[in-house]
């Protein structure tokens, strides 16, 4: 017979997921309820902690992500108990989760922060590698040391960073869009960055700031064996720092870009030989395309009919929310992207079950200048806000929507440039009646502003522009800027003086 649902006073606050959203949520709950035990359930032996947090402006924030052993988290917050195990099942009617180690944990409030997993272009192929967490990034480094040529499929943030960071290895980069970085940039910004790709890298590597913890060397008996298919937490900013991304050859950059195409078929060497297919050699400047005489472990046929051989393929084609362990027997409402739908208090469609980070899909009436993107900044903000909402609901208090959801704001680095994205930076969903204003100094900065009805709706800032705070304010207050015209981007005018 099914156990009766326990009263909501029974059980603990339980958070599932050791990534940025889960750890931030657990830390906030631990601070808010110092005398209560907070359970953090994670399949990984290391957790992701936010360090060196800096609030740059009202909404823009910068931080490092540090991998730490879970014991460090328990030392900082004595009321957090980390359970190193995957989740086998969620029994929402009984208010409990069953972990892979067979234990049941009753919750009064549960927050699911299990992240997302990479969409692999081909499952089960040993030559196809998805980069999502630290383990897969280290496996990639191991493979790269032996590689003469690799193929990168995808156009998101990880693909962009990889293409720039890899040295001493030919890279064929296949994207389905017309220009690189389609998620973040328009064609103009892409062109600005592409010139950096073509140039030889001169910047010396700066030693990485983060302490790296590996899972090797820990006593095996001290932790239960996790299933090998458990998904680790997403990589944080600067994830490639400290990884030696060098192939076998002695050159900096050799990149060939194939645009407007996708993967049609992947062949292993034997199959390729039997079919008597022909592949292209690495394209050289202005030379006619030649047949490759070298044999490769794996071959990729693209939808543009070109075939290239390589040592291995990196699949960087995005992620899907990691909802699978929680769906059986529960009637969650899911978003179009497969995420758990959450309302404006990070609450799912099930009682006392919240979600934050990559696993969730926002289903509230969004601010006109905010959109959900599965980025570290939003994982931190959602985890923090979910904890506040759980605390408020437990105490019977009401809580206002967090201000960070008023404006999309993200700061990162691509190709060694500082990149700030604000609001509808790519005119997402604005229709055709918007206009763009641009300022570009090759090799130094790229500034794009999205205007609609005289109001600033978004901006892309590449380089050290010092415009982020002013533009953030202009987007937030929706002031009519029609009278300023081109002066908005005139480098000889200190725009801050206008709006003091």
From Swiss-Prot:
Matching InterPro entries: FAD-bd_OxRdtase, FAD/NAD-bd_sf, FAD/NAD-binding_dom, FAD/NAD-linked_Rdtase_dimer_sf, Rubredoxin_C
GO cellular component: cytoplasm; nucleus; sarcomere
Keyword hit for Ribosomal protein: no
Record family assignment: Belongs to the class-I pyridine nucleotide-disulfide oxidoreductase family. PYROXD1 subfamily.
Swiss-Prot/TrEMBL keywords: Acetylation, Cytoplasm, FAD, Flavoprotein, NADP, Nucleus, Oxidoreductase
Entry EC number(s): 1.8.1.-
Xref: Pfam families: Pyr_redox_2, Rubredoxin_C
Upper lineage: Eukaryota, Metazoa, Chordata, Craniata, Vertebrata
Domain of life of the organism encoding this protein: Eukaryota
Cofactor binding summary note: Binds 1 FAD per subunit.
Biological role: Probable FAD-dependent oxidoreductase; involved in the cellular oxidative stress response. Required for normal sarcomere structure and muscle fiber integrity.
Subcellular location: Nucleus; Cytoplasm; Cytoplasm, Myofibril, Sarcomere
Positions carrying N-acetylmethionine: 1
GO biological process per UniProt: cellular response to oxidative stress
GO molecular function annotation: oxidoreductase activity
Enzyme's top EC category: oxidoreductase
Identification of the protein by name: Pyridine nucleotide-disulfide oxidoreductase domain-containing protein 1
Disulfide bonds: none
Cofactor(s) the protein needs: FAD
Gene3D superfamilies: 3.30.390.30, FAD/NAD(P)-binding domain (3.50.50.60)
């Amino acid at each position: 017979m099914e156990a009766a649902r326990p009263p909501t006073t029974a059980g603990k606050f339980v958070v599932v997921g050791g990534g940025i959203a889960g750890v931030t949520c657990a830390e906030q709950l631990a601070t808010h309820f110092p005398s209560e035990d907070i359970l953090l359930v994670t399949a990984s032996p290391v957790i992701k902690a936010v360090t060196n947090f800096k609030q740059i402006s009202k909404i823009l924030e910068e931080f490092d992500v540090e991998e730490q052993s879970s014991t460090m988290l328990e030392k900082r917050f004595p009321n957090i108990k980390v359970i190193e195990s995957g989740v086998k099942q969620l029994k929402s009617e009984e208010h409990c989760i069953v972990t892979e180690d067979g234990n049941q944990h009753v919750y009064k409030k549960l927050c699911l922060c299990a992240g997302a997993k990479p969409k692999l272009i081909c499952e089960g192929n040993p030559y196809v590698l998805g980069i999502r967490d630290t383990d897969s990034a280290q496996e990639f480094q191991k493979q790269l040391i032996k590689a003469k040529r690799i193929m990168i499929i995808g156009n998101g943030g990880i693909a962009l960073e990889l293409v720039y960071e890899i040295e001493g290895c030919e890279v064929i980069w296949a994207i389905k869009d017309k220009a690189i970085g389609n998620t973040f940039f328009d064609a103009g910004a892409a062109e600005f960055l592409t010139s950096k790709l073509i140039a030889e890298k001169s910047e010396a590597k700066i030693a990485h700031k983060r302490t790296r913890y590996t899972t090797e060397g820990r006593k095996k008996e001290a932790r239960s064996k996790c299933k090998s298919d458990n998904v680790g937490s997403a990589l944080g900013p600067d994830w490639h720092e400290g990884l030696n991304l060098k192939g076998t050859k002695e050159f900096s950059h050799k990149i060939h870009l194939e645009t407007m195409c996708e993967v049609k078929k992947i062949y292993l060497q034997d199959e390729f030989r039997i079919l008597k297919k022909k592949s292209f050699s690495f394209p050289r400047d202005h030379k006619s395309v030649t047949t490759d005489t070298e044999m490769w472990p794996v071959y990729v046929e693209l939808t543009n009919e070109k075939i290239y051989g390589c040592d291995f393929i990196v699949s960087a084609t995005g992620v899907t929310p990691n909802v699978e362990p929680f769906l059986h027997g529960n009637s969650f409402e899911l978003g179009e992207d497969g995420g758990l739908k959450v309302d404006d208090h990070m609450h799912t469609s099930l009682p006392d079950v919240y979600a934050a980070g990559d696993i969730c899909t926002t289903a509230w009436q969004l601010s006109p200048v905010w959109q959900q993107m599965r980025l570290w900044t939003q994982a931190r903000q959602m985890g923090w806000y979910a904890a506040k909402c759980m605390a408020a609901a437990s105490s019977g208090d009401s809580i206002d929507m967090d201000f960070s959801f008023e404006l999309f704001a993200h700061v990162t680095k691509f190709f060694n440039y500082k990149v700030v994205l604000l609001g509808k930076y790519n005119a997402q969903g604005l229709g055709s009646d918007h206009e763009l204003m641009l300022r570009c100094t090759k090799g130094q900065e790229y500034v794009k502003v999205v205007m609609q009805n005289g109001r600033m709706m978004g901006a892309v800032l590449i380089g050290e522009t010092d415009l982020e705070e002013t533009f953030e304010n202009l987007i937030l207050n929706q002031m009519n800027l029609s009278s300023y015209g081109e002066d908005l981007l005139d480098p000889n005018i200190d725009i801050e003086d206008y709006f003091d």
